[in-house]
Swiss-Prot record:
<dbReference type="InterPro" id="IPR029066">
    <property type="entry name" value="PLP-binding_barrel"/>
</dbReference>
<keyword id="KW-0663">Pyridoxal phosphate</keyword>
<dbReference type="Pfam" id="PF01168">
    <property type="entry name" value="Ala_racemase_N"/>
</dbReference>
<dbReference type="GO" id="GO:0008784">
    <property type="term" value="F:alanine racemase activity"/>
</dbReference>
<comment type="similarity">
    <text>Belongs to the alanine racemase family.</text>
</comment>
<dbReference type="InterPro" id="IPR000821">
    <property type="entry name" value="Ala_racemase"/>
</dbReference>
<keyword id="KW-0413">Isomerase</keyword>
<protein>
    <recommendedName>
        <fullName>Alanine racemase</fullName>
        <ecNumber>5.1.1.1</ecNumber>
    </recommendedName>
</protein>
<feature type="modified residue" description="N6-(pyridoxal phosphate)lysine">
    <location>
        <position position="44"/>
    </location>
</feature>
<dbReference type="GO" id="GO:0005829">
    <property type="term" value="C:cytosol"/>
</dbReference>
<feature type="binding site">
    <location>
        <position position="142"/>
    </location>
    <ligand>
        <name>substrate</name>
    </ligand>
</feature>
<dbReference type="InterPro" id="IPR011079">
    <property type="entry name" value="Ala_racemase_C"/>
</dbReference>
<comment type="pathway">
    <text>Amino-acid biosynthesis; D-alanine biosynthesis; D-alanine from L-alanine: step 1/1.</text>
</comment>
<dbReference type="InterPro" id="IPR009006">
    <property type="entry name" value="Ala_racemase/Decarboxylase_C"/>
</dbReference>
<dbReference type="GO" id="GO:0009252">
    <property type="term" value="P:peptidoglycan biosynthetic process"/>
</dbReference>
<comment type="function">
    <text>Catalyzes the interconversion of L-alanine and D-alanine. May also act on other amino acids.</text>
</comment>
<feature type="active site" description="Proton acceptor; specific for L-alanine">
    <location>
        <position position="273"/>
    </location>
</feature>
Length: 388
Protein backbone atom coordinates (compact mmCIF):
# COMPACT_ATOMS: atom_id res chain seq x y z
CA UNK A 1 0.00 0.00 0.00
CA UNK A 2 1.26 3.49 -0.83
CA UNK A 3 0.13 6.81 0.56
CA UNK A 4 -0.43 10.14 -1.13
CA UNK A 5 0.68 13.44 0.42
CA UNK A 6 -1.72 15.13 2.80
CA UNK A 7 -1.66 18.93 2.73
CA UNK A 8 -2.21 21.09 5.80
CA UNK A 9 -5.67 22.64 5.94
CA UNK A 10 -5.40 26.42 5.36
CA UNK A 11 -5.81 28.46 8.53
CA UNK A 12 -5.35 25.51 10.88
CA UNK A 13 -2.60 25.83 13.49
CA UNK A 14 -1.91 22.11 13.80
CA UNK A 15 -3.75 18.96 12.90
CA UNK A 16 -3.81 15.22 13.32
CA UNK A 17 -4.79 13.83 9.94
CA UNK A 18 -6.48 10.43 10.13
CA UNK A 19 -6.37 8.42 6.93
CA UNK A 20 -9.55 6.35 6.92
CA UNK A 21 -8.31 4.48 3.87
CA UNK A 22 -5.50 3.14 6.04
CA UNK A 23 -7.99 2.11 8.72
CA UNK A 24 -10.01 0.21 6.12
CA UNK A 25 -6.88 -1.48 4.76
CA UNK A 26 -5.82 -2.56 8.24
CA UNK A 27 -9.22 -4.01 9.09
CA UNK A 28 -9.31 -5.95 5.82
CA UNK A 29 -5.86 -7.35 6.62
CA UNK A 30 -6.98 -8.32 10.12
CA UNK A 31 -10.01 -10.07 8.64
CA UNK A 32 -7.70 -12.10 6.42
CA UNK A 33 -5.48 -13.05 9.36
CA UNK A 34 -8.49 -13.96 11.50
CA UNK A 35 -9.57 -16.72 9.13
CA UNK A 36 -13.10 -17.84 9.95
CA UNK A 37 -13.24 -15.74 13.13
CA UNK A 38 -15.05 -12.43 13.20
CA UNK A 39 -13.39 -9.11 14.03
CA UNK A 40 -14.28 -6.88 16.96
CA UNK A 41 -12.52 -3.56 16.34
CA UNK A 42 -11.45 -1.90 19.58
CA UNK A 43 -12.19 1.83 19.54
CA UNK A 44 -11.66 2.72 23.21
CA UNK A 45 -9.94 5.96 24.24
CA UNK A 46 -11.67 7.79 21.39
CA UNK A 47 -10.36 5.30 18.88
CA UNK A 48 -6.80 5.38 20.25
CA UNK A 49 -6.83 9.12 19.58
CA UNK A 50 -8.09 8.72 16.01
CA UNK A 51 -11.78 9.41 16.69
CA UNK A 52 -13.97 6.52 17.79
CA UNK A 53 -17.03 7.21 15.65
CA UNK A 54 -15.20 7.74 12.36
CA UNK A 55 -12.99 4.72 12.98
CA UNK A 56 -15.99 2.60 13.97
CA UNK A 57 -17.87 3.43 10.79
CA UNK A 58 -14.83 2.72 8.65
CA UNK A 59 -13.99 -0.52 10.45
CA UNK A 60 -17.54 -1.81 10.14
CA UNK A 61 -17.65 -0.95 6.44
CA UNK A 62 -14.36 -2.83 5.99
CA UNK A 63 -15.71 -5.99 7.59
CA UNK A 64 -15.55 -5.73 11.37
CA UNK A 65 -18.81 -6.95 12.91
CA UNK A 66 -18.54 -5.71 16.48
CA UNK A 67 -16.88 -2.90 18.43
CA UNK A 68 -15.09 -2.90 21.77
CA UNK A 69 -14.67 -0.03 24.22
CA UNK A 70 -13.59 0.36 27.82
CA UNK A 71 -16.47 2.31 29.35
CA UNK A 72 -20.22 2.43 29.00
CA UNK A 73 -19.96 6.17 28.33
CA UNK A 74 -17.77 5.43 25.30
CA UNK A 75 -20.36 2.96 24.06
CA UNK A 76 -23.21 5.42 24.59
CA UNK A 77 -21.32 8.04 22.59
CA UNK A 78 -21.16 5.62 19.66
CA UNK A 79 -24.89 5.01 19.97
CA UNK A 80 -25.59 8.75 20.09
CA UNK A 81 -23.57 9.10 16.88
CA UNK A 82 -25.75 6.55 15.12
CA UNK A 83 -23.62 3.41 15.44
CA UNK A 84 -26.00 0.44 15.70
CA UNK A 85 -23.52 -2.46 15.53
CA UNK A 86 -22.90 -4.59 18.63
CA UNK A 87 -20.73 -2.76 21.18
CA UNK A 88 -19.06 -4.35 24.21
CA UNK A 89 -17.90 -2.30 27.23
CA UNK A 90 -15.64 -3.96 29.82
CA UNK A 91 -14.39 -1.51 32.48
CA UNK A 92 -16.82 -0.23 35.12
CA UNK A 93 -16.68 1.80 38.32
CA UNK A 94 -18.27 0.39 41.50
CA UNK A 95 -21.95 1.24 41.75
CA UNK A 96 -22.35 1.52 37.99
CA UNK A 97 -25.93 1.92 36.81
CA UNK A 98 -26.14 -0.30 33.75
CA UNK A 99 -29.67 0.86 32.95
CA UNK A 100 -28.64 3.31 30.21
CA UNK A 101 -26.40 0.65 28.67
CA UNK A 102 -29.23 -1.87 28.53
CA UNK A 103 -31.59 0.72 27.07
CA UNK A 104 -29.04 1.40 24.31
CA UNK A 105 -28.41 -2.31 23.65
CA UNK A 106 -24.81 -2.09 24.85
CA UNK A 107 -23.23 -5.40 25.81
CA UNK A 108 -21.69 -5.53 29.29
CA UNK A 109 -18.52 -7.42 30.18
CA UNK A 110 -18.46 -8.31 33.87
CA UNK A 111 -15.37 -9.11 35.92
CA UNK A 112 -16.86 -9.87 39.34
CA UNK A 113 -19.93 -11.15 41.16
CA UNK A 114 -20.63 -7.56 42.20
CA UNK A 115 -20.76 -6.44 38.58
CA UNK A 116 -23.07 -9.33 37.75
CA UNK A 117 -25.37 -8.22 40.57
CA UNK A 118 -25.32 -4.65 39.25
CA UNK A 119 -26.19 -5.86 35.75
CA UNK A 120 -29.01 -8.02 37.14
CA UNK A 121 -30.32 -5.10 39.17
CA UNK A 122 -30.48 -2.95 36.03
CA UNK A 123 -32.18 -5.75 34.09
CA UNK A 124 -34.86 -6.19 36.73
CA UNK A 125 -35.45 -2.45 37.16
CA UNK A 126 -35.77 -1.82 33.45
CA UNK A 127 -37.38 -5.06 32.38
CA UNK A 128 -34.62 -5.45 29.80
CA UNK A 129 -32.50 -8.55 29.33
CA UNK A 130 -28.82 -7.76 29.83
CA UNK A 131 -26.43 -9.05 27.18
CA UNK A 132 -23.42 -10.16 29.20
CA UNK A 133 -19.88 -11.25 28.46
CA UNK A 134 -17.76 -12.63 31.28
CA UNK A 135 -14.16 -11.49 31.43
CA UNK A 136 -11.86 -13.93 33.21
CA UNK A 137 -8.34 -13.48 34.52
CA UNK A 138 -5.96 -16.05 33.05
CA UNK A 139 -2.70 -14.46 34.16
CA UNK A 140 -2.71 -10.70 33.61
CA UNK A 141 -3.94 -10.21 37.19
CA UNK A 142 -5.82 -7.11 36.21
CA UNK A 143 -9.50 -6.93 35.25
CA UNK A 144 -11.37 -10.23 35.17
CA UNK A 145 -12.91 -12.94 37.34
CA UNK A 146 -10.20 -14.71 39.35
CA UNK A 147 -9.97 -18.48 38.81
CA UNK A 148 -10.86 -19.16 42.46
CA UNK A 149 -14.13 -17.24 42.08
CA UNK A 150 -15.03 -18.59 38.67
CA UNK A 151 -17.05 -21.64 39.84
CA UNK A 152 -19.31 -19.35 41.88
CA UNK A 153 -19.66 -17.06 38.87
CA UNK A 154 -20.72 -19.99 36.69
CA UNK A 155 -23.36 -21.00 39.23
CA UNK A 156 -24.73 -17.47 39.36
CA UNK A 157 -24.74 -17.23 35.57
CA UNK A 158 -26.72 -20.44 35.27
CA UNK A 159 -29.33 -19.03 37.65
CA UNK A 160 -29.50 -15.69 35.81
CA UNK A 161 -29.95 -17.40 32.44
CA UNK A 162 -32.71 -19.57 33.87
CA UNK A 163 -34.50 -16.40 35.01
CA UNK A 164 -34.12 -14.85 31.53
CA UNK A 165 -32.39 -11.92 33.23
CA UNK A 166 -29.35 -12.16 30.97
CA UNK A 167 -28.37 -13.28 27.52
CA UNK A 168 -24.99 -14.92 27.96
CA UNK A 169 -23.03 -13.66 24.99
CA UNK A 170 -19.32 -14.32 25.49
CA UNK A 171 -16.31 -15.41 27.49
CA UNK A 172 -13.16 -13.32 27.11
CA UNK A 173 -9.71 -12.80 28.57
CA UNK A 174 -6.75 -10.54 27.83
CA UNK A 175 -3.18 -11.45 26.96
CA UNK A 176 -0.20 -10.64 29.18
CA UNK A 177 2.31 -10.04 26.37
CA UNK A 178 0.76 -7.63 23.88
CA UNK A 179 3.99 -7.45 21.86
CA UNK A 180 5.53 -10.90 22.31
CA UNK A 181 3.32 -13.59 20.77
CA UNK A 182 5.98 -16.26 21.22
CA UNK A 183 6.06 -16.04 25.04
CA UNK A 184 5.04 -19.30 26.80
CA UNK A 185 2.55 -17.43 29.00
CA UNK A 186 0.37 -16.93 25.91
CA UNK A 187 -0.05 -20.69 25.59
CA UNK A 188 -0.61 -21.04 29.33
CA UNK A 189 -3.33 -18.41 29.18
CA UNK A 190 -4.96 -20.14 26.23
CA UNK A 191 -4.94 -23.44 28.09
CA UNK A 192 -6.44 -21.87 31.22
CA UNK A 193 -9.07 -20.12 29.14
CA UNK A 194 -10.16 -23.33 27.44
CA UNK A 195 -10.29 -25.14 30.78
CA UNK A 196 -12.57 -22.46 32.21
CA UNK A 197 -14.71 -22.57 29.07
CA UNK A 198 -15.01 -26.36 29.44
CA UNK A 199 -15.93 -26.01 33.13
CA UNK A 200 -18.82 -23.73 32.23
CA UNK A 201 -20.06 -26.16 29.58
CA UNK A 202 -19.85 -29.03 32.06
CA UNK A 203 -22.08 -27.00 34.37
CA UNK A 204 -24.62 -26.37 31.63
CA UNK A 205 -23.52 -22.80 30.96
CA UNK A 206 -22.85 -22.05 27.31
CA UNK A 207 -21.40 -18.92 25.78
CA UNK A 208 -22.25 -17.87 22.24
CA UNK A 209 -18.66 -16.79 21.51
CA UNK A 210 -15.23 -17.03 23.11
CA UNK A 211 -12.33 -14.69 22.39
CA UNK A 212 -8.84 -13.93 23.65
CA UNK A 213 -6.78 -12.79 20.63
CA UNK A 214 -5.49 -9.22 20.64
CA UNK A 215 -3.65 -7.55 17.75
CA UNK A 216 -0.42 -9.51 18.10
CA UNK A 217 -2.19 -12.85 18.44
CA UNK A 218 -4.42 -12.05 15.46
CA UNK A 219 -1.41 -11.21 13.31
CA UNK A 220 1.10 -13.79 14.55
CA UNK A 221 -0.66 -16.57 16.49
CA UNK A 222 -3.53 -17.97 14.41
CA UNK A 223 -3.56 -21.05 16.65
CA UNK A 224 -5.01 -18.90 19.45
CA UNK A 225 -7.94 -17.66 17.37
CA UNK A 226 -11.40 -18.68 18.57
CA UNK A 227 -14.77 -17.20 17.54
CA UNK A 228 -13.74 -13.54 17.62
CA UNK A 229 -10.53 -11.53 17.59
CA UNK A 230 -10.21 -8.16 19.36
CA UNK A 231 -7.53 -6.11 17.58
CA UNK A 232 -6.83 -2.63 18.87
CA UNK A 233 -3.51 -1.04 17.91
CA UNK A 234 -3.35 -2.89 14.58
CA UNK A 235 -6.59 -1.25 13.45
CA UNK A 236 -4.68 2.03 13.50
CA UNK A 237 -1.78 0.66 11.49
CA UNK A 238 0.79 0.38 14.25
CA UNK A 239 2.62 -2.91 14.50
CA UNK A 240 1.68 -4.93 17.59
CA UNK A 241 5.15 -6.49 17.42
CA UNK A 242 7.49 -3.65 16.35
CA UNK A 243 10.54 -5.90 16.02
CA UNK A 244 8.69 -7.81 13.27
CA UNK A 245 8.24 -4.68 11.15
CA UNK A 246 4.99 -3.18 9.92
CA UNK A 247 3.39 -6.60 9.28
CA UNK A 248 1.59 -5.10 6.27
CA UNK A 249 -0.21 -2.48 8.37
CA UNK A 250 -0.39 1.20 7.41
CA UNK A 251 -0.26 3.89 10.14
CA UNK A 252 -3.34 6.08 9.92
CA UNK A 253 -2.26 9.21 11.81
CA UNK A 254 -0.08 12.10 10.64
CA UNK A 255 0.55 15.05 12.96
CA UNK A 256 1.62 18.29 11.34
CA UNK A 257 1.60 22.03 11.79
CA UNK A 258 2.55 25.19 9.92
CA UNK A 259 5.86 26.96 10.43
CA UNK A 260 4.83 30.03 12.42
CA UNK A 261 8.06 32.02 12.27
CA UNK A 262 11.53 31.86 10.76
CA UNK A 263 14.35 33.85 12.32
CA UNK A 264 18.12 34.11 12.47
CA UNK A 265 20.14 33.19 15.55
CA UNK A 266 23.74 34.32 15.94
CA UNK A 267 26.55 32.04 17.07
CA UNK A 268 26.67 31.85 20.87
CA UNK A 269 23.01 32.71 21.38
CA UNK A 270 20.65 30.26 23.08
CA UNK A 271 17.06 29.35 22.29
CA UNK A 272 14.03 28.50 24.43
CA UNK A 273 13.84 28.20 28.22
CA UNK A 274 17.12 27.66 30.02
CA UNK A 275 19.18 28.03 26.85
CA UNK A 276 19.86 24.30 26.84
CA UNK A 277 20.96 24.68 23.22
CA UNK A 278 23.47 27.31 22.15
CA UNK A 279 23.94 28.00 18.46
CA UNK A 280 27.44 26.78 17.49
CA UNK A 281 27.44 29.12 14.50
CA UNK A 282 25.17 31.62 12.81
CA UNK A 283 22.02 29.74 11.86
CA UNK A 284 18.30 29.96 11.21
CA UNK A 285 15.49 28.45 13.24
CA UNK A 286 11.81 27.76 12.61
CA UNK A 287 9.18 28.14 15.30
CA UNK A 288 6.48 25.45 15.37
CA UNK A 289 3.28 26.46 17.23
CA UNK A 290 2.68 23.19 19.07
CA UNK A 291 3.97 22.03 22.44
CA UNK A 292 3.58 19.69 25.35
CA UNK A 293 0.03 20.91 26.05
CA UNK A 294 -0.81 19.51 22.61
CA UNK A 295 0.92 16.16 23.04
CA UNK A 296 4.52 16.90 22.02
CA UNK A 297 6.32 15.36 24.96
CA UNK A 298 8.61 17.78 26.79
CA UNK A 299 11.18 15.00 27.03
CA UNK A 300 11.57 15.22 23.24
CA UNK A 301 13.28 18.59 23.58
CA UNK A 302 16.53 18.59 21.62
CA UNK A 303 15.89 15.01 20.50
CA UNK A 304 13.08 14.94 17.96
CA UNK A 305 13.23 15.74 14.27
CA UNK A 306 10.50 17.06 11.98
CA UNK A 307 10.16 16.92 8.22
CA UNK A 308 9.95 20.25 6.42
CA UNK A 309 10.18 20.46 2.63
CA UNK A 310 11.55 16.96 2.35
CA UNK A 311 14.34 17.33 4.93
CA UNK A 312 14.61 16.20 8.54
CA UNK A 313 15.18 19.22 10.80
CA UNK A 314 16.47 18.71 14.36
CA UNK A 315 14.58 20.14 17.29
CA UNK A 316 16.66 22.48 19.44
CA UNK A 317 16.08 23.70 22.97
CA UNK A 318 13.25 22.78 25.26
CA UNK A 319 9.75 21.93 24.12
CA UNK A 320 7.47 24.57 25.65
CA UNK A 321 3.78 24.40 26.45
CA UNK A 322 2.79 25.93 23.11
CA UNK A 323 5.82 25.79 20.83
CA UNK A 324 9.28 24.52 20.04
CA UNK A 325 12.10 25.30 17.61
CA UNK A 326 13.97 23.43 14.92
CA UNK A 327 17.33 24.27 13.42
CA UNK A 328 17.29 25.06 9.70
CA UNK A 329 21.03 25.51 9.43
CA UNK A 330 23.07 28.44 8.11
CA UNK A 331 23.02 29.94 4.66
CA UNK A 332 20.13 30.54 2.25
CA UNK A 333 16.73 29.69 3.65
CA UNK A 334 14.79 26.78 2.19
CA UNK A 335 11.90 27.09 4.65
CA UNK A 336 9.31 29.87 4.82
CA UNK A 337 6.59 30.80 7.25
CA UNK A 338 3.49 28.78 6.46
CA UNK A 339 5.40 25.75 5.21
CA UNK A 340 4.21 22.38 6.45
CA UNK A 341 6.11 20.61 9.23
CA UNK A 342 5.37 16.91 9.77
CA UNK A 343 6.02 15.73 13.31
CA UNK A 344 5.20 12.08 12.73
CA UNK A 345 3.33 9.97 10.22
CA UNK A 346 3.55 6.68 8.31
CA UNK A 347 7.20 7.36 7.45
CA UNK A 348 6.69 6.96 3.72
CA UNK A 349 8.03 10.44 2.94
CA UNK A 350 10.95 10.29 5.32
CA UNK A 351 9.11 11.76 8.29
CA UNK A 352 9.51 10.34 11.80
CA UNK A 353 6.99 7.72 12.89
CA UNK A 354 5.07 7.19 16.11
CA UNK A 355 7.47 4.33 16.82
CA UNK A 356 10.42 6.72 16.42
CA UNK A 357 8.91 8.98 19.07
CA UNK A 358 8.25 6.01 21.34
CA UNK A 359 11.86 4.86 21.02
CA UNK A 360 13.14 8.35 21.87
CA UNK A 361 11.16 8.73 25.08
CA UNK A 362 11.13 5.10 26.18
CA UNK A 363 7.44 4.43 25.78
CA UNK A 364 5.13 2.63 23.33
CA UNK A 365 3.50 3.96 20.19
CA UNK A 366 0.08 3.57 21.84
CA UNK A 367 0.94 6.50 24.09
CA UNK A 368 2.21 8.58 21.18
CA UNK A 369 -0.95 8.39 19.07
CA UNK A 370 -3.29 8.86 22.04
CA UNK A 371 -1.46 12.04 23.09
CA UNK A 372 -2.35 14.66 20.40
CA UNK A 373 -4.89 17.02 21.96
CA UNK A 374 -5.43 20.67 22.85
CA UNK A 375 -5.02 22.89 19.82
CA UNK A 376 -4.53 20.03 17.40
CA UNK A 377 -7.52 19.71 15.09
CA UNK A 378 -8.43 16.20 14.01
CA UNK A 379 -9.02 16.01 10.26
CA UNK A 380 -10.18 13.01 8.24
CA UNK A 381 -9.10 11.97 4.78
CA UNK A 382 -11.36 9.43 3.14
CA UNK A 383 -9.07 8.02 0.45
CA UNK A 384 -5.45 8.90 1.07
CA UNK A 385 -4.22 5.35 0.53
CA UNK A 386 -3.97 3.43 -2.71
CA UNK A 387 -3.73 -0.35 -2.91
CA UNK A 388 -0.70 -1.69 -4.71
Amino acid sequence: MTTTPISLTPGVLAEAVVDLGAIAHNVRLLRERAGSAQVMAVVKADGYGHGATAVARTALAAGAVELGVASVDEALTLRADGITAPVLAWLHAPGMDFGPALAADVQIAISSIRQLDEALDAARRTGTTATVTVKIDTGLNRNGVAPALYPEMVTRLRQAVAEDAIRLRGLMTHMVHADAPEKPINDIQSQRFKQMLDHARDQGVRFEVAHLSNSSATMARPDLTLDLVRPGIAVYGLSPVPRLGDMGLVPAMTVKCAVALVKSVSAGEGVSYGHTWIAPHDTNVALLPIGYADGVFRSLGGRLEVLINGKRRPGVGRVCMDQFLVDLGPGPLDVAEGDEAILFGPGTRGEPTAQDWADLVGTIHYEVVTSPRGRITRVYREAETVER
